[in-house]
Amino acid sequence: VQTAGYSLTEQQPLNNIVRVAYQAMAGVLGGCQSLHTDSMDETLGLPTESAVRVALRTQQIIAHETGVHRTVDPLAGSYYVESLTDQMESDANILIDEIDGLGGVVQGIHKGYFRRSIAEASYRFGQEMEAGDRIVVGVNAYRAGNEDAQVDLLQIPHSVETIQCERLETFLKSRDDDKAMLAL
């Protein structure tokens, strides 16, 4: 399970720590086998070392301080969780039927189904935010403090980009294009 990077915001990035923590806890409560927690500053660029450490500490706190590991299925029997699961299953079956109707996943890709679906969902999300139907703390509500820089950004020297471009150029010149095309 990976926490939902799309839910992170550029505004008030420290709030992303809370977003990542509750998403991680939800994954653990749902019985995930492995967990990746996004860093609070990933919407701004590559994560800083301190942000990565906070993401790691989030996992460690959940693992060692919450007691969640003491039971196999802590949400078993919850009517609310069962109703959410039933709704998710119903929604998933509708999507599966749509994709099957297109001729399968590959045809869906060729027909632009997935890109279109993601774009439409993103548009709806934005419309809901603008209308105030969906509150995103720090973005369309509780915005005081947005003018303050809250986190440092990772600064990568220009020389690193130059070196990587040179390495790529050398690689591209030395590779066998026929073998590359065959491999693809």
Please report, for each region that a protein language model flagged, where it lies by residue:
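Flexible, glycine-rich loop/tail regions that form catalytic "lids" or insertion modules at the edges
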Residues: T48-E49, R53, R57-Q60, H64-L184
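Core alpha/beta catalytic barrel or barrel-like domain that forms the active/cofactor pocket
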Residues: V1-E10, M25-L44, I61-E82
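Active-site cavity-forming subdomains of large catalytic enzyme subunits
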Residues: E10, N15-A21
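Glycine-rich, charged/polar anion/phosphate-binding loops
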Residues: R19-Q23, Y123-F125
